[in-house]
UniProtKB/Swiss-Prot annotation:
It is found in: Cell membrane. One of its GO terms (biological process) is proteolysis. The lineage of its organism: Bacteria, Bacillati, Bacillota, Bacilli, Bacillales. It catalyses: Release of signal peptides from bacterial membrane prolipoproteins. Hydrolyzes -Xaa-Yaa-Zaa-|-(S,diacylglyceryl)Cys-, in which Xaa is hydrophobic (preferably Leu), and Yaa (Ala or Ser) and Zaa (Gly or Ala) have small, neutral side chains. The gene is lspA. One of its GO terms (molecular function) is aspartic-type endopeptidase activity. Keywords: Aspartyl protease, Cell membrane, Hydrolase, Membrane, Protease, Transmembrane, Transmembrane helix. This is Lipoprotein signal peptidase. This protein specifically catalyzes the removal of signal peptides from prolipoproteins.
Length: 154
């Protein structure tokens, strides 16, 4: 249940922040938070990361539905006693559903977190994207830990 609560929290935060951006900012408008480093910028994306597969909504609906079903299956089957795995999957589930809602309702994803890292203008993203990335990183860490345990047992 905890892992679904994590997903729900991510979905709520993601949708609330996107709603605030859509209601209070013009498309393309940028608000500096830390000048030359961090901005809130109203942006839309009809594709995936870096705009790849722009406009291929049917593809995103199909893939995201399969991913959501897979994550729920893994949560139900493999997270007992595996807290890190459960948190990773909860974050991934929340992120996947957050962007799925945008695609289903708006036919585009609302992005707004704009970061510049040492003169590199990083692609604008949102809370769902961040949640997916952190979830994948935690999943990778879990896999490394599991691999280390198996080697120790041999």
């Amino acid at each position: 249940m905890l892992y679904y609560m994590i997903a729900l929290l991510i979905i709520a935060a993601d949708q609330l922040t996107k709603w605030l951006v859509v209601k209070n900012m013009e498309l393309g408008q940028s608000i500096p938070i830390i000048d030359q480093v961090f901005y809130i910028t109203s942006h839309r994306n009809t594709g995936a990361a870096w705009g790849i597969l722009a406009g291929q909504m049917w593809f995103f609906y199909l893939i995201t539905t399969a991913v959501i079903i897979g994550i729920v299956y893994y949560i139900q089957r493999y997270t007992k006693g595996q807290r890190l795995l459960g948190v990773a999957l909860g974050l991934m589930l929340g992120g996947a559903i957050g962007n799925f809602i945008d695609r289903a309702v708006r036919q585009e994803v609302v992005d707004f977190i704009h970061v510049i890292i040492v003169n590199y203008n990083y692609p604008i993203f949102n809370i769902a994207d961040s949640s997916l990335c952190v979830g994948v990183m935690l999943l990778f860490i879990q896999m490394l830990l599991d691999s280390g345990k198996k080697k120790k047992e041999q």
